[in-house]
C-alpha cells in the first residue's frame, strides 16, 4: 500500500510532508444563450507529520560469529526483520487505519464462525463502499488466514463471487491484526508497579484493542510512506567500542488516511 512519493513534497520541518488535495464544483445547467456556468477548482495542501520512528542495535561478538561459521550474525539480521520489524510495521499500520475517525466499519463487533458468515460480511463491506462511491479498482482485502480458510472450505455450490471484487487478497495473522496496539519503548520497566516491562520492545495488543476479522483498503485513501531506513553492518574493524559485529536498524515513516477519503477504509472486527 505504499503511496506514490512523487505526489508529495517535504514540509517546512524535516518531520513533515505536504500532501496535495483537490476539490471542485459539480455540474451546472448549460444555457444555450450564455453557455457554461463557471466552476471553482481548489487545490490545497495538507501538512502531515511522520508518526513512526523505531529502531534497535544488536552486537554479535566476533568470536561467536567465527565459531558458528558466520551463522550467528547472518541469522540475526534476517530473523530480526522477518519476526520483529515486518510484524510490527504491519500491526502499526492496520491499527492506525482502524483507529481513524470516520472510516466505515461494522456497527457492532462480531465473530464470524462460518464461511457463509464471512461472505455475508464481505458482501456488506463491498456494498457499503459501492454506495459511498469508492472506486472498485485498487480495493485490497486483508483477512485472517482462519477466516479465509472457512471461505475456501465452503461447499462448491456456495457463491464466492464477492472474493473476486478485490485487487488482491492478503492473509494477515491475527497476532498483528488489531484495532489498537501499544508500542514498547525498549527502555522502561514498570512491572514492579503493576505495569508492563517494555524493555523487550516490540508491540502488544492494547487494552482497548479488538481483533480485526478483515479490512478492505482502497489504496488511494491511505498515506503510507517510508522516508528513511537504516539497515547496515558495522564490522569489528570499524567498531570502536567492542570486538563485535554491530547491526543497527531504524525505520522512519508515515501511516495515515486522507481525511476526505475515509470511506475508502472498511473495518470488520470482533
Regions found by a protein language model. Name each.
Residues 32-41, 76-84:
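Short, mixed-charge, low-aromatic patches
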Residues 29-34, 260:
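Short, glycine/acidic-enriched capping/hinge loops at junctions between secondary-structure elements
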Residues 2-5, 94-97, 139-142:
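Short coil/turn segments at secondary-structure boundaries
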Residues 1-9, 126-131:
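Short, charged/polar N-terminal "headpieces" of proteins
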Residues 18, 24, 37, 44-69, ...:
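Structured, hydrophobic secondary-structure cores that serve as assembly/anchoring elements
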Residues 65-134, 145, 267-270:
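Alpha-helical scaffold segments that mediate packing/assembly in large oligomeric complexes
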Residues 1-3, 10-26, 46-51, 68, ...:
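Sequence/fold signature of self-assembling virion shell proteins
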Amino acid at each position: 500500500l505504499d503511496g506514490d512519493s512523487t505526489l508529495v513534497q517535504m514540509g517546512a520541518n524535516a518531520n513533515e510532508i505536504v500532501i496535495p488535495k483537490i476539490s471542485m464544483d459539480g455540474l451546472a445547467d448549460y444555457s444555450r444563450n450564455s453557455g457554461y456556468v463557471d466552476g471553482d477548482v481548489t487545490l490545497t495542501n495538507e501538512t502531515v507529520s511522520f508518526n513512526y520512528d523505531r529502531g534497535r542495535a544488536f552486537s554479535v561478538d566476533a568470536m561467536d560469529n567465527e565459531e558458528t561459521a558466520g551463522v550467528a550474525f547472518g541469522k540475526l539480521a534476517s530473523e530480526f526483520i522477518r519476526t520483529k520489524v515486518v510484524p510490527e510495521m504491519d500491526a502499526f499500520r492496520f491499527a492506525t487505519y482502524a483507529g481513524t475517525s470516520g472510516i466505515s466499519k461494522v456497527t457492532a463487533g462480531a465473530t464470524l464462525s462460518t464461511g457463509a458468515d464471512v461472505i455475508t460480511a464481505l458482501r456488506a463491506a463491498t456494498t457499503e463502499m459501492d454506495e459511498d462511491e469508492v472506486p472498485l479498482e485498487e480495493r485490497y482485502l486483508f483477512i485472517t488466514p482462519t477466516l479465509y480458510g472457512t471461505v475456501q472450505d465452503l461447499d462448491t455450490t456456495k457463491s464466492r463471487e464477492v472474493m473476486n471484487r478485490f485487487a488482491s487478497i492478503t492473509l494477515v495473522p491475527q497476532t498483528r491484526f488489531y484495532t489498537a496496539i501499544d508500542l514498547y519503548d525498549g527502555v522502561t520497566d514498570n512491572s514492579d508497579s503493576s505495569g508492563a516491562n517494555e524493555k523487550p520492545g516490540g508491540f502488544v495488543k492494547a487494552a482497548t484493542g479488538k481483533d480485526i476479522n478483515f479490512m478492505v483498503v482502497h489504496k488511494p485513501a491511505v498515506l503510507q510512506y517510508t522516508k528513511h531506513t537504516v539497515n547496515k553492518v558495522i564490522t569489528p574493524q570499524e567498531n570502536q567500542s567492542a570486538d563485535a559485529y554491530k547491526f543497527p536498524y531504524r525505520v522512519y515513516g508515515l501511516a495515515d488516511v486522507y481525511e476526505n477519503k475515509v470511506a475508502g477504509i472498511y473495518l470488520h472486527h470482533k
